[in-house]
C-alpha cells in the first residue's frame, strides 16, 4: 500500500523512517495504566513520515509502553527490513526496546524528548506526525470512541480507516 503512494508523491519507494507513540483509547476496563491513569486499551502505531500506518497493535492498557513498542518492532522487522530510524516518545526509552532494536540490522531508535523548560502544550518535532494520524482516526465514527469488545475488532477498524486514508490520498494525486 505504501509503494504506490510513495511513488506518486515522488518519495523513495520504501519508508526510511517512522514515528511511534501511544494514545489512550477507551472508557471501559480492559486494563489499567497506572502511569497515565487510563482504564481500557492502548494503541501502538508505527507510521511512515507521511502519516500512513505501517503497523498498529491494540492491547490492554496494563501493558507498559516499552513492552508494546518491543512487540511492534518485533512484528515489523521482517516486513520492513529497509527501515532505518524510528522516532519515539520517552515512554519507549527502555532496555527491552533497545534489545529488540539491536536484533534488526541498520535500525536505530531516536527518543524525542520534551524540554524541561517548556510549560504547557508544545509541538514536538516528528511526534506531531503520529498525533495527526490518531486525529485522522478520530474522525472515523467507529474510532472516535472505543465501543468494541475485542481488541482485534478495534485493530480491524483502524486498518479500514488506514485504507480509507491511503485511497483518499491516492485519489487526490
Task: Please identify what each model-predicted range represents.
Residues 1-173:
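Short alpha-helical elements
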Amino acid at each position: 500500500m505504501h509503494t504506490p503512494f510513495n511513488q506518486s508523491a515522488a518519495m523513495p519507494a520504501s519508508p526510511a523512517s517512522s514515528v511511534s507513540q501511544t494514545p489512550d483509547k477507551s472508557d471501559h476496563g480492559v486494563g489499567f495504566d497506572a502511569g497515565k491513569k487510563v482504564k481500557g486499551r492502548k494503541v501502538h502505531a508505527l507510521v511512515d513520515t507521511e502519516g500512513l500506518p505501517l503497523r498498529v497493535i491494540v492491547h490492554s492498557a496494563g501493558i507498559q509502553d516499552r513492552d508494546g513498542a518491543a512487540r511492534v518492532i518485533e512484528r515489523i522487522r521482517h516486513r520492513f527490513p529497509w527501515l532505518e530510524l524510528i522516532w519515539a516518545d520517552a515512554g519507549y526509552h527502555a532496555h527491552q526496546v533497545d534489545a529488540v532494536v539491536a536484533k534488526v540490522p541498520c535500525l536505530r531508535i531516536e527518543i524525542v524528548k520534551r524540554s524541561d523548560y517548556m510549560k504547557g502544550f508544545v509541538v514536538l518535532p516528528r511526534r506531531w506526525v503520529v498525533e495527526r494520524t490518531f486525529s485522522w482516526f478520530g474522525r472515523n465514527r467507529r474510532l472516535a470512541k472505543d465501543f468494541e469488545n475485542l481488541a482485534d475488532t478495534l485493530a480491524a477498524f483502524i486498518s479500514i480507516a488506514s485504507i480509507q486514508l491511503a485511497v483518499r490520498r491516492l485519489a487526490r494525486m
